[in-house]
Amino acid sequence: MENSTTTTEWYENQIREDGCFCMRSMQKAPGYVQKLNWTEKEFTQGLTYIQLRKDNKPVGFIEYALGEQAWRAVHADGYLVIHCIWIAVTGLGLGSQLIQRCIQDAITLGKKGVAVVTNIDTSWAPGPEIFLKNGFRHVEDAPYSFQLYIYKLNQEHSDPYFPDNWVLRLDRFSEGLTILRTHQCPYLEIATHNVIEAAETVGIQPEIIDIRDRSQLMELSPTPYGVFHVICNGELISYHRMTPRSFAKKLTMLYSKS
């Protein structure tokens, strides 16, 4: 335990001992185990994972990485990049506390600032509101409602930026059904199985590409989200988990047009 107040405790980089905040009710599930292993490996590359507990119950977490090692498709060398932030108990300012901790780490480490990829259309990426409250500003947009927000510690520093070849990235997967996945999120194993189940009902065999490192992610990812994508005949179906039925419906519509 790093520090505590009377009721709120901070646990840093103890995911093996304290567990993952997400999917904690399914700790024997393959995705959960893969997340633990992935996170511990990324600790050696500068990843930070902080979990908050209130009265010994998990109430939120934040995960962030060095820009050079971030699992988001954004050029952010010299910055810290927030992967995820989630608060289960609102109204206590816990989310802002976690963001401010990340900013303080950026100062301590001599970084240019903090960057985060947001999206207003899904809960699988954070929304921008809490970052605006904490002094972040919007710098760039990408397809599928992704946006880049930054907190810059020195205005003379260059801004992070998105790649500019999103269409080309999708064109690489112009034939068949492709799943790009990582183990950064514990739900992605379930998401993958849902696609496979849906594909079987339509008579399609998906190709699964496991993204092993940042360089591969930066080369292949068709959105800033980076860690999970389903692409069918060059068209993005999803970058997050969906039910098998929803995937099957989309696949049927796409193949009926071809």
Language-model segments: residues:
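Short amphipathic alpha-helix that is part of the acyltransferase structural core
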Residues: 1-54, 166, 185-187, 191-197
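Conserved beta-strand in the GNAT
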Residues: 51, 57-68, 81, 86
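A short, internal acetyl-CoA/4′-phosphopantetheine-binding micro-motif in the GNAT/acyltransferase core
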Residues: 83-92, 120
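Non-catalytic, surface beta->alpha helical segment in thiol-disulfide oxidoreductase systems
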Residues: 232-258
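Conserved beta-hairpin
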Residues: 46-62, 230-235
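Conserved GNAT acetyl-CoA-binding A-motif
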Residues: 106-120
